[in-house]
Amino acid sequence: MDTIVTAILLGIVEGLTEFLPVSSTGHLILATELFGYDAHQWAMFNVVIQLGAILAVVVQYWRTFWAVGMGLLRLEPISLRFLRNLLAAFIPSAILGLALKKYIDVLLGSPSVVCWALIAGGIAILVIEKHAKQGEPSGIGQLPLRQAIGVGLAQCLAMVPGVSRSGATIMGALAMGIERRTAAEFSFFLAIPTMLGATTLELLDNRDALLGGTMGVGWSEIGVGFAVSFVVALAVIRLFVAYVSRAGFKPFAWYRIAAGAVALGWLAMR
């Protein structure tokens, strides 16, 4: 398959799945298997196009970030708490990620692990949706520190490919009584430091390939994938918050279970 077409397809997969509770990393791993791509060749590409999804969050919520930034300059309590909560949620996965990244990549990056994680995550969403009590709408700067730390600890589960970073953080938030819209937006905002950190770490680990031009794919493919990921992720963010505020997360749970089961069957028959 043409590399530009491959870049477009993977950009669509990344943009569609990054902020939905279905695991973008898991879907990229399965897409690589399904279409027969060279996983090593496209590994760096899959990391870099996540920056397109990050940019989508910044564009969608730039007014929020501007207001928080101005509030920080004025030392406003709500803006200080916003930053405190974001850092408190980011730090657990940053520490654990640095400590365990190489082991997780080696031991848990297989398609079968992704499938089982999709199924387990789907069941967890159904259980949490059934039993979690919805809190009152509130902003991230109004959440107590313990809830922010809890969301950060939940994010650590997403180091297993197929669990889903957004799924883990949103479900962790719901389990602690945070209402759906705030849970989703907290997950979006938390993606920025988390994904920037992960991408920076990958780029540093692969700096020789970057400088030597041996990344496996060219800058044109990366540019196309980045742009497609950005556009698709922006559309998903705008639709997702409104949808889950009304309908909840059960459809994503059933999708995860079905996708994991079908993929397991396909892997077994290859």
From Swiss-Prot:
<feature type="transmembrane region" description="Helical">
    <location>
        <begin position="42"/>
        <end position="62"/>
    </location>
</feature>
<keyword id="KW-0961">Cell wall biogenesis/degradation</keyword>
<keyword id="KW-0812">Transmembrane</keyword>
<dbReference type="GO" id="GO:0005886">
    <property type="term" value="C:plasma membrane"/>
</dbReference>
<keyword id="KW-0472">Membrane</keyword>
<dbReference type="InterPro" id="IPR003824">
    <property type="entry name" value="UppP"/>
</dbReference>
<feature type="transmembrane region" description="Helical">
    <location>
        <begin position="3"/>
        <end position="23"/>
    </location>
</feature>
<dbReference type="Pfam" id="PF02673">
    <property type="entry name" value="BacA"/>
</dbReference>
<feature type="transmembrane region" description="Helical">
    <location>
        <begin position="217"/>
        <end position="237"/>
    </location>
</feature>
<keyword id="KW-1133">Transmembrane helix</keyword>
<keyword id="KW-0378">Hydrolase</keyword>
<keyword id="KW-1003">Cell membrane</keyword>
<protein>
    <recommendedName>
        <fullName>Undecaprenyl-diphosphatase</fullName>
        <ecNumber>3.6.1.27</ecNumber>
    </recommendedName>
</protein>
<feature type="transmembrane region" description="Helical">
    <location>
        <begin position="249"/>
        <end position="269"/>
    </location>
</feature>
<comment type="similarity">
    <text>Belongs to the UppP family.</text>
</comment>
<comment type="function">
    <text>Catalyzes the dephosphorylation of undecaprenyl diphosphate (UPP). Confers resistance to bacitracin.</text>
</comment>
<dbReference type="GO" id="GO:0046677">
    <property type="term" value="P:response to antibiotic"/>
</dbReference>
<feature type="transmembrane region" description="Helical">
    <location>
        <begin position="108"/>
        <end position="128"/>
    </location>
</feature>
<feature type="transmembrane region" description="Helical">
    <location>
        <begin position="86"/>
        <end position="106"/>
    </location>
</feature>
<keyword id="KW-0573">Peptidoglycan synthesis</keyword>
<keyword id="KW-0997">Cell inner membrane</keyword>
<dbReference type="GO" id="GO:0050380">
    <property type="term" value="F:undecaprenyl-diphosphatase activity"/>
</dbReference>
<dbReference type="GO" id="GO:0008360">
    <property type="term" value="P:regulation of cell shape"/>
</dbReference>
<dbReference type="GO" id="GO:0071555">
    <property type="term" value="P:cell wall organization"/>
</dbReference>
<keyword id="KW-0133">Cell shape</keyword>
<keyword id="KW-0046">Antibiotic resistance</keyword>
<feature type="transmembrane region" description="Helical">
    <location>
        <begin position="184"/>
        <end position="204"/>
    </location>
</feature>
<dbReference type="GO" id="GO:0009252">
    <property type="term" value="P:peptidoglycan biosynthetic process"/>
</dbReference>
